[in-house]
A protein has these predicted regions:
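Metal-dependent amide/peptide-bond hydrolase catalytic core
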Residues: 1-116, 126-130
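Short glycine/serine- and small hydrophobic-enriched flexible loop segments
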Residues: 120-123
Length: 130
C-alpha cells in the first residue's frame, strides 16, 4: 500500500533491490514484479464528499472522521487520472472485524447502517446544488 508521493514501479524496484541485498549468498531468490496500483488522495471539497459527509452525520448522528486509510484499489487513482473524478469510499467496518484474516467478521448493525448511509448519500447527492 502506497502513500500519495510514491509510485508503484519505484517501490517495487526498491523492494526487489532490498531483497537482493539482504539475501544470503548461499540462497537464490527470484522476484517477479507484477502490475501495481498507484496511490490516490481525493479532494474533500466536492459535491460527492459533502454529500457523503452529511449522510454519515444524518444516519450515525455523529461527524465522520476522515482518515488517510485504505487498501489497494487501483481503479480509484485511474478514475482520478483519466476521468478527473474523485471517488467516494465509505467504510462501515471496524478494526475488530479483522479484515482479510481467517476470522474476519462484519456486524449486521454496521451492514444495515451502511445501507442506510448509502441511501442517504444518494439523496444528498441529488439535492446538492454545487
Amino acid at each position: 500500500r502506497l502513500v500519495s508521493n510514491q509510485s508503484s514501479s519505484e517501490i517495487s524496484s526498491l523492494f526487489t533491490n532490498h531483497l537482493n541485498n539482504i539475501c544470503p549468498k548461499s540462497c537464490k531468490i527470484k522476484v517477479t514484479e507484477h502490475h501495481g496500483g498507484e496511490p490516490c488522495v481525493v479532494n474533500t471539497d466536492t459535491k460527492g464528499y459533502r454529500s457523503a459527509y452529511k449522510a454519515f452525520q444524518d444516519v450515525w448522528k455523529k461527524d465522520p472522521v476522515p482518515t488517510f486509510d485504505g487498501g489497494s484499489i487501483p481503479i480509484v487513482a485511474l478514475f482520478k487520472k483519466e476521468l478527473s473524478l474523485d471517488s467516494i469510499l465509505m467504510g462501515f467496518g471496524l478494526d475488530e472485524d479483522a479484515i482479510h484474516s481467517p476470522n474476519e467478521s462484519y456486524g449486521l448493525f454496521n451492514f444495515y447502517k451502511g445501507i442506510e448511509t448509502i441511501t442517504c448519500f444518494y439523496q444528498n447527492f441529488a439535492e446538492n446544488e454545487k
